[in-house]
């Protein structure tokens, strides 16, 4: 609902601003958690954070209560799940962290509000010329039938060039 949207937007802005200033991701999550817990009402949000070193391809995915992340590489699908609570639920953040090396042609996809029924779903046919935005739209069209009625849906796609 409206409260979830506001919590998500607040968390996004908070994380973005602090990370842009050079704050460490783990500490930033702890600060966000403390801020959400001190509210009078129950406020929580999921976090799905991707850090990429664009020179080396080294990447870190940090997840707290978030839906699966899918990495597509040379026709293979790798699913990253994290069985962690959202930020703002418990006093200590227990985010899951995965480190990996991204390569040219990799596609990283996360979603909210939709999860494919297949544990390792294939991507909609796109061809190499499709943009990440076009691929995100095709994914929403394909997977939206599995979404809960009335839930908002979003997909983020990053194609490594």
Feature annotation, model-predicted:
Residues 52, 95, 160:
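Hydrophobic pocket-lining residues within nucleotide cofactor-binding pockets
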Residues 42-47, 80-121, 148-149:
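Acidic loop->beta-strand submotif enriched in PP2C/PPM serine/threonine phosphatases
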Residues 75-76, 122:
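Residue-level detector of alpha-helical segments with a strong bias toward transmembrane helices
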Residues 3-75, 81, 144-151:
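Catalytic core of PPM/PP2C metal-dependent serine/threonine phosphatase domains
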Residues 1-6, 113-117:
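Short acidic, Gly/Ser-rich segments with clustered Asp/Glu that frequently serve as metal-coordination loops
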Residues 33-34, 94-97, 140-142:
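Glycine-rich, charged/polar anion/phosphate-binding loops
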Residues 26-30, 102-161:
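C-terminal catalytic subdomain
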């Amino acid at each position: 609902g409206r409260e979830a949207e506001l919590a998500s937007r607040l968390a996004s802005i908070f994380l973005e601003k602090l990370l842009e200033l050079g704050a460490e991701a783990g500490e930033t999550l702890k600060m966000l958690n403390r801020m959400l817990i001190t509210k009078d009402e129950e406020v929580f949000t999921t976090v799905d954070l991707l850090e990429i070193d664009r020179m080396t391809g080294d990447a870190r995915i940090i997840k707290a209560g978030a839906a699966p992340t899918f990495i597509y590489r040379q026709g293979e699908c790798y699913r990253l799940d994290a069985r962690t609570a959202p930020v703002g639920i418990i006093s200590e953040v227990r985010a899951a962290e995965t480190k990996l090396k991204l390569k040219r042609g990799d596609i990283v996809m996360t979603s909210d509000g939709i999860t494919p029924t297949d544990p390792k779903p294939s991507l909609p046919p796109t061809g190499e010329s499709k943009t990440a935005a076009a691929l995100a739209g095709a994914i929403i069209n394909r997977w939206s039938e599995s979404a809960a009625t009335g839930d908002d849906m979003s997909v983020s796609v990053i194609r490594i060039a």
